[in-house]
C-alpha cells in the first residue's frame, strides 16, 4: 500500500531565520495579504503554506507571553522573600534588647541603701536568696522616709505612753502634750524610726512580691522571700485598754475635798 506523504510542516533553517527577523522587526499579527507575500518569499527555501506562516506567528506570541509570565512570577517571589526577611528582622531585635532590663535589674543591687542592708541582715541573717531588684526598690523607698516625725504624731505617741504609765504621769502629759512629751519623744525617736522603717520596707516588699506573684500565676508558683512571709507589725499609737484615769481623778478629787473640809 502506498504511503501518503506527511502534511506536517518542517521549516528549514533559512525559513526560521527569516521569520524570526520579521518578528523582531515588529511583525506580530500579519494580515492575509502579508501572509501571502511571506509565503511566496519563503517558498524559495522549502515547502510552506499560508497556514504555516499564520500559526508560526501565533505560536511565537504565545511562547513569548509564557516567558514573560515566568519572569514576572519569579520577580514576585523574590520580592515576597525579601519582605519576609525584612519583617523577620525587627521581630528578632527585642531578643537582643531583652538583655538591657536584666543588666539594669542586676545593676540596681549596687544602689541598695546601707541601712536596709544592715536591717535585712540583722533580722534575716539566713536569707541568702533575696532578690536584688526588690532590695534595691526597698532601699529607694526607705531612703525617701523623712527622718523627722510629725509633731502632732509625736504628741499623740507621748500622750498614749503617758496614759499607759499612770494617773500622775497622764496629768503631767495632758497639761503639756507638745512640750512635756519632748523628752520622751527624744528618747524613743530612734526606736520608732527603726520600727517604722522596717514596717515601711516590709509593706513595699509585700506589695512588690504580691504583684510579682500575681504576674507569675500562669507561669508557676513563685517562691516569696522571707521578708514577705513575715506578718506586718502594727504600732499601738493609741491605748486599747482602759487605764483607769477617771477612777484615779475621782479618788484624787475626793481626797482633796476631805482635806479641805478638815
Swiss-Prot record:
Q: Which residues form a coiled coil?
A: none
Q: Where does this protein reside within or beyond the cell?
A: Nucleus
Composition skew (Low complexity), residue ranges = 83-99, 251-262
Name the PANTHER family for this protein.
Answer: WUSCHEL-RELATED HOMEOBOX 1-RELATED (PTHR45940), WUSCHEL-RELATED HOMEOBOX 3 (PTHR45940:SF42)
Q: Which UniProt keywords apply?
A: Developmental protein, DNA-binding, Homeobox, Nucleus, Transcription, Transcription regulation
Q: Which domain of life is it from?
A: Eukaryota
Tissue-level expression: Predominantly expressed in tissues enriched for shoot meristems and young lateral organ primordia. First expressed in lateral domains of shoot meristems. It is then expressed in the margins of young lateral organ primordia. Not expressed in roots, seedling leaves or fully expanded coleoptiles. Also expressed in vegetative shoot apices (five leaf primordia and the SAM) and in the male inflorescence. Expressed at low level in the female inflorescence.
Family stated for the protein in its record? Belongs to the WUS homeobox family.
GO biological process annotation, one example: plant organ development
Q: Which residues bind DNA?
A: 4-68
Task: Tell me, in a sentence or two, what this protein's role is.
Answer: Probable transcription factor required to initiate organ founder cells in a lateral domain of shoot meristems. Involved in leaf formation.
Broad class of where this protein is predominantly found: nucleus
Q: What is the lineage of its organism?
A: Eukaryota, Viridiplantae, Streptophyta, Embryophyta, Tracheophyta
The protein's name is WUSCHEL-related homeobox 3A
Q: Does the keyword Transcription apply?
A: yes
Q: Supply one GO CC term from the record.
A: nucleus
Q: InterPro entries, from UniProt?
A: HD, Homeodomain-like_sf, WUSCHEL-like
Q: Name one Pfam family in it.
A: Homeodomain
Gene (name only): WOX3A
Q: Which GO terms describe its molecular function?
A: DNA binding; DNA-binding transcription factor activity
Q: Where is this region: Disordered?
A: 83-106, 239-262
